[in-house]
Structure formats: structure tokens, C-alpha cells
Amino acid sequence: LQAFKSEVAAWMAENVPSDPGFLLPLTFLEVGTEQQLDFLREWQHKLWQAGFLGMHWPTEYGGQGADSAYQFIVDKELGRHRAPIIFNTIGLNWVGPLLLDMGTEEEKSKYIKNILSAEEIWCQGFSEPDHGSDLGAVQTRAVKEGDEYVVNGSKIWTTLGNYADHMILLARTNTKTERKYDGLSFFLSPMKV
């Protein structure tokens, strides 16, 4: 691991971008301009091309197939070198792991590599106008019609929603449950139709 840490540190010293001449966000919640988005997308893509994203994700989907300790080293070096943020957080931390664990082969092949490379941006659709962040009170409904679900409802606070290609959406698929958190399902929804 020490040799890898040295490799990452050397790469960061050479490749972490200098001041771009405009304000960079400190978290993905603060991305507010196309200029910031383009800069951060290019940075994430560069990290992925260098082999420093998805360290423990399978190689067949664009990951590195290594132990998660390697990603920890990369993350520490990113902080130590004051690198720009990795902004596709919803894709990297929620959608990707969920798909790797529960997704179909088709979904993994379609989405995982594009999450890592920042080719596609993800947002989340959990909170709703009348219930805020109380996920147990979700009113958005998903009703199965044939082979598909029809989703009806409203979402708010969809961080990165104005830039996203896809949304991970929480909807109620069963209204006849005893507990308010039962009957909820995740859906992958396109943002650009």
C-alpha cells in the first residue's frame, strides 16, 4: 500500500489543477454554474482515467477491482493536496453501490462506467414539497402498468437536478402497509427526455 500511496501522491502533485480563476465549490451541494460543472466533470474524468476512482468496483464496469483500502488512500491524498471535490457524489456513493449490489447486468453495463467517468450526472429525488425530508411520508406513487411503472408526484431539493442526466427516485409502490417506511422503492429515472 505504501508504494501505491507514493504513486498517488506523485500523481496528485503533478495533476491537481491550480486555481481556475473562478470560485470552486467546497461540496457538491454548491455547484451552481456550468463553468464549475465542466471543470469538476473534467477533473473527475481525469481521476478516473488515471485509475483513482472506483478502486474497489469491478473492472468489467470501469472500476479498478482492488481492495477498498486503495480508495481510502486516494481520498486522503485528494484532501492532502487540496484537490477539487469529486462532485458526482450521488452517483458514486448511492447509485453505483446500489447497482453493483442489486442491479441487473444491463443496468451495471449501462450506468456504472458513466458514473465513474462523470459522463453522466445523477441527482436524488427523495424530499417532497409537503413532507420535506420525512421519507416515510413520501407521496409520490409508482404504479405498475404492464412491464413498466408509471410514477406520479413531486420532488424538491434535487441537488444537481438542473445538471443531472438521471435521478435515483424514491416512490411508494405499496400503500397498504402497517409501517410508513414499508412499500417504498427506488427507481432510476431519466432527467432529460
Regions found by a protein language model. Give the residues of each.
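Hydrophobic, small-residue-rich alpha-helical packing segments that form membrane-like cores
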Residues: 131-134, 149
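N-terminal glycine-rich flavin-associated loop
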Residues: 87-106, 132
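Amphipathic, small/basic residue-rich leader segments at the start of a protein or domain
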Residues: 1-89, 106, 110-117
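A structural signal for short hydrophobic beta-strand segments in well-ordered beta-sheet cores
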Residues: 140-143
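A short core secondary-structure module
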Residues: 148, 152-193
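A short, Trp-centered hydrophobic/proline-enriched beta-strand micro-motif
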Residues: 118-126, 170
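Short, solvent-exposed loop/turn elements at beta->coil junctions and helix N-caps
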Residues: 60, 127-131, 156-157
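Short coil/turn connectors at secondary-structure junctions
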Residues: 50, 81-84, 116-121, 145-147, ...
